[in-house]
Swiss-Prot record:
PANTHER family: PROGRAMMED CELL DEATH PROTEIN 5 (PTHR10840:SF0). It comes from Pyrobaculum aerophilum (strain ATCC 51768 / DSM 7523 / JCM 9630 / CIP 104966 / NBRC 100827 / IM2). GO terms for molecular function: DNA binding. GO terms for cellular component: cytosol. This is DNA-binding protein PAE3044. Disulfide bonds: none annotated.
Length: 110
């Protein structure tokens, strides 16, 4: 009978650990959603509707580029280095700068 209770305790411990993992994962996802919502609110404040639509299009095609661009836009607006609201033309110029920084260059030697 002691073997059965040992297995029960072991099984209960596995369940407890799995539950903790799931709770941690859910909390991380919730925090990520909060950060994304805060970022979206900030972007709505600093971009014109046209610029925001362009950013959304970029996000569909190149999510990593959109994320870098979003961070750059928020930083520029927070430090006052760009006039707010940012219009589509200004967004294009900032996009070119961010793209040139994030683009990977591949060189092949033959």
């Amino acid at each position: 009978m002691s073997e059965g209770s040992f297995e029960d305790r072991e099984l209960e411990e596995i369940r407890r650990k799995k539950l903790e993992e799931l709770q941690k994962k859910a909390e991380l996802e919730r925090q990520a959603q909060i950060v994304a919502a805060q970022r979206r609110i900030a972007l709505k404040k600093i971009l014109t509707p046209e610029a925001l639509a362009r950013l959304d299009n970029i996000r569909v095609v190149r999510p990593e580029l959109a994320e870098a661009l979003e961070q750059q836009l928020i930083n520029l607006a927070a430090t006052g280095r760009v006039r707010v609201p940012i219009d589509e033309e200004t967004l294009k110029k900032i996009l070119e700068a961010v793209y040139s920084q994030t683009r990977r260059e591949y060189r092949f030697r033959l």
